[in-house]
Swiss-Prot record:
Protein task: Nucleotide-binding protein.
Record's keyword terms, sorted: Nucleotide-binding
Protein name stated in the entry: Nucleotide-binding protein EF_1165
UniProt organism field: Enterococcus faecalis (strain ATCC 700802 / V583)
GO molecular function: nucleotide binding
One GO cellular component, as annotated: cytosol
Domain of life: Bacteria
Homology family: Belongs to the YajQ family.
Xref: InterPro entries: DUF520 (IPR007551), UPF0234-like_C (IPR035571), UPF0234_N (IPR035570), YajQ-like_sf (IPR036183)
Pfam families (UniProt xref): DUF520 (PF04461)
């Protein structure tokens, strides 16, 4: 019987349905919160970008904190959301845009690949568009690679799927 290779994919994804659900729950909480009564506070999703609008920068940060709490409860990695600087909007309000990062860019894919190669674990890794496929003869080696990748300090959250 031939030795079968095991593999898994390293991906970085944001579940848009969960983001939409978290936004709805956060908006409900904003309507009921005493410190937001009568003030402007809104969260929208426009073209895969989060838009947070509030009366001032302080309230924008409060709205983001509420949203982050809801996203964490729904297992959406907040590491994959990169907010820009706050800017002035119409009506004296403040606005911030948040980019939702999905997929592993080439620069970070190379860092991950290099870390796997330098670890000395007997596996092969290939960059495939926005994910990385890791293959090896032993499932134990693959689990060592997963542990190694969890330790890396990257600007995105990594997930592992297609474990075979």
């Amino acid at each position: 019987m031939a030795a079968k290779e095991a593999s898994f994919d390293v991906v970085s994804e944001v579940n848009m349905e969960e983001v939409k659900n978290a936004i709805q729950i956060a908006l409900k909480e904003l309507k009921n919160r005493f410190d937001f009564k009568g003030s402007i506070a809104d969260i929208k999703l426009e073209n895969d970008k989060l838009v947070v609008v509030a009366e001032d920068d302080y309230k924008v940060e409060q709205v983001k904190d509420i949203l982050f709490g809801k996203l964490v409860k729904r297992n959406v990695p907040i590491k994959n959301i990169h907010f820009s600087e706050s800017e002035k909007a119409l009506g004296g309000t403040a606005r911030q845009y948040g980019d939702l990062i999905s997929g592993i860019d080439k620069e970070n894919a190379k860092k991950i690949n290099t870390a796997i190669k330098n670890s000395g674990i007997k596996v092969k890794s290939q960059i495939q568009e926005d994910k990385i496929r890791v293959t090896g003869k032993s499932r134990d080696d693959l689990q060592k690679v997963m542990a190694l990748l969890r330790e890396l300090d990257l600007p995105m959250a990594l997930e592992f799927n297609n474990y075979r």
